[in-house]
Amino acid sequence: MAMNNILGLFAHSPLKPLQKHSEKVTECSDLLIPFFQTTFSKNWEQAEEKRLEISQCEREADSLKREIRLKLPRGLFLPIDRTDLLELVTQQDKLANYAKDIAGRMIGRQFGIPEEMQEEFLHYVKRSLDAIHQAHRVIEEMDKLLETGFKGRELKLVNDMIQELDSIEDDTDQMQIKLRKMLYTIESRYNPIDVMFLYKIIEWVGVLADQAQRVGSRIELMLARS
């Protein structure tokens, strides 16, 4: 995005660039669904195309992050500290990085999720992405929160949304346990290194939900300080 466009967003609302970045990060993460679907069919050429899409999207998110860091005006009349806003951008940018890393590691190993685990695994990925979408919804709601001076019913709504984000992350924890148990019952069929790789993939997908929760926690901390 051009520098003057970023400045224009800041002029309209100091939170708009943050929301734009969150939107891009969410877009990157969502690309994991078609990526994993191509790995299920062992179509590694098509999976590589999807990985490149994720990588390009991550670069765009990174560019937005850098522009925000460089152009976030000082002396904003906000009940939020500038440093807190920059830290929030850093935390949500990690989501795009993790999506890129997951796809890259899958392509590097070219070893897919066992067929009997694929349906449950895809549910798990989608639930982890639900956490990212919930974090994005909280970011989108912050404009209204700004209008109310970070208080009242809007503050309660945002806090409730963050609690829902925590609940989604709890769901992914339980789904991760279930997937590990499924893998344990079939791991004797596979090379031990491949088995360890599968356990790591399950863990990495869970990190997406964990990181989305960290974004929510960062917002919660910002609100407590405001």
From Swiss-Prot:
Pfam families: PhoU_div
Membership in a protein family: Belongs to the UPF0111 family.
NCBIfam families the UniProt entry points to: TIGR00153 family protein
The name this protein goes by in its record: UPF0111 protein HI_1603
Source organism of this protein record: Haemophilus influenzae (strain ATCC 51907 / DSM 11121 / KW20 / Rd)
